[in-house]
């Protein structure tokens, strides 16, 4: 049996921070790039042929595929909200499509879920499928669930983006971002459109911050995964946990972790200690993503 307590935290540690980013994208007037989005891997050869017949596209060499992350649309990225967008189904074969370039993701996910009998809920990644290579935060969820289905699909028809491959299903222990695959139509075939060399693969998922890329893994425990009664715990260590709430940003969880360590709030017994954050604590440190406008409470 675990022990639950109310965790009182210094409020001045969690002041609201906000920042704005103005992005100005300049295109030459003659540089027209129509954008098409592939939903559910439904782009067929016939669709490409129709585009070829129009004046914008004279050759399939003008097509360049890109992965676009859903978080850019402002979807909720906290673990309780994100996992509600995924569900298990049987009888539907998975589909995989490749893409040439992708965005950097603020939030990625990595699932290790087992059934109550100990068997795996998710399939292992096929050869050639590696984790999404650029994630600021990796939300790693371990736990159990009924997993009523052969594969976990996206309920809204999006893809799970891996390293230059997008799949309709989630693979066990493989980091992914939610997104869609789009294609750019270039005015003319340009071999140097993606001229930069591929970014080198991350080492153990985290590199020196001075390299311009830094990833942090945040760990959770889940029970009843995939059901309406799913419960999530933020893992401080293997005996100390915090009840997870949708309002907790990644930045808040990292400072919460530090506070629990420095204030001696970790479990000092062999039993599990579960904290609950005081509802009056302001948890709005940081942002879910720099482009998302946070809704103010009425």
From Swiss-Prot:
Keyword Disulfide bond tagged: yes
Compartments reported by the entry: Secreted
Superkingdom of the source species: Viruses
Signal peptide boundaries: 1-32
Keywords for this protein: Disulfide bond, Glycoprotein, Secreted, Signal
InterPro entries: GPC_filovir-type_extra_dom
Entry-listed glycosylation sites: 40, 204, 228, 238, 257, 268
Pfam families linked to this entry: Filo_glycop
Location, primary (coarse class): secreted
GO cellular component: extracellular region
Disulfide links within the chain: 108-135, 121-147
Protein family per UniProt: Belongs to the filoviruses glycoprotein family.
Record-given protein name: Super small secreted glycoprotein
Organism: Zaire ebolavirus (strain Mayinga-76) (ZEBOV)
């Amino acid at each position: 049996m675990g022990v639950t307590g109310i965790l009182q935290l210094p409020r001045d540690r969690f002041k609201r921070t906000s920042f704005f980013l103005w992005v100005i994208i300049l295109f030459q007037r003659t540089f027209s790039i129509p954008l098409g989005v592939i939903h559910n891997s439904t782009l067929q050869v016939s669709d490409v042929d129709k585009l070829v017949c129009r004046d914008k596209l004279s050759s399939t060499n003008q097509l360049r595929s890109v992965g676009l992350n859903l978080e850019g649309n402002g979807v909720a990225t906290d673990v309780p909200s994100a996992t509600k967008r995924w569900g298990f189904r049987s009888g539907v074969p998975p589909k995989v499509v490749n893409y040439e370039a992708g965005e950097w993701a603020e939030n990625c996910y990595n699932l290790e879920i087992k059934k109550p009998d100990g068997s795996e809920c998710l399939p292992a990644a096929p050869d050639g499928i590696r984790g999404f290579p650029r994630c600021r935060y990796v939300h790693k969820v371990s736990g159990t669930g009924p997993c009523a289905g052969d594969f976990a699909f996206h309920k809204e028809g999006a893809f799970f983006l891996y390293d230059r491959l997008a799949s309709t299903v989630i693979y066990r222990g493989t980091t992914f971002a939610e997104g869609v695959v789009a294609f750019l139509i270039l005015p003319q075939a340009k071999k140097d459109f993606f001229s930069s060399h591929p970014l080198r693969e991350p080492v153990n998922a985290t590199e020196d911050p001075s390299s311009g890329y830094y990833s942090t893994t945040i760990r959770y425990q889940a029970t009843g995964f995939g059901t309406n009664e799913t419960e999530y715990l933020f893992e401080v260590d293997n005996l100390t946990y915090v009840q997870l709430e949708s309002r907790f940003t990644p930045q808040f969880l990292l400072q919460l972790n530090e506070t629990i360590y420095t204030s001696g709030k970790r479990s000092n017994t062999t039993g599990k200690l579960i904290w609950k954050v005081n509802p009056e604590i302001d948890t709005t440190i940081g942002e879910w993503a720099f482009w998302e406008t946070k809704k103010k409470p009425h």
